[in-house]
Regions:
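Charge-dense, helix-prone N-terminal extensions
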Residues: 1-118
Length: 118
């Protein structure tokens, strides 16, 4: 189960990004860039793939916490409480960073999942 409100917000933020698809994952909704996990919604939180260069800095933010879906912390992923994100600009910066990181991987083919409308 996941928040449709958060999913819609991510869809709007990602609609202009080329190669974005969505599919169910971890009981939530995942957004992929050319087949590489970018971000998603699990419950009432946004899952963000930070990568190693931004992970520690992301955890210093009051709106972020470690991803511990299985009871163990998964490095390079954080949960973001969208209600605690102070501004739309910060939200878009978070989305831009996660798209940039996911885009740094080789494209997976074929890309499966439902295309994010744009």
């Amino acid at each position: 189960m996941y928040s449709e409100r958060l999913a819609d917000r991510l869809r709007r933020a990602l609609q202009a990004v080329e190669g974005v698809t969505e599919k169910t994952l971890f009981g939530g909704l995942a957004f992929l860039v050319y087949g590489n996990l970018c971000c998603g919604v699990i419950g009432d939180a946004i899952l963000v793939r930070t990568g190693p260069d931004f992970y520690d800095a992301a955890l210093q933010e009051p709106y972020a916490r470690p991803m511990d879906f299985t009871g163990r912390v998964l490095r390079n992923f954080v949960y973001v409480d969208l209600d605690a994100v102070p501004t739309d600009e910060v939200f878009h910066e978070i989305v831009t960073r996660t798209v940039s990181y996911a885009s740094s991987f080789p494209r997976k083919t074929p890309v499966t999942g439902r295309r994010v409308a744009g």
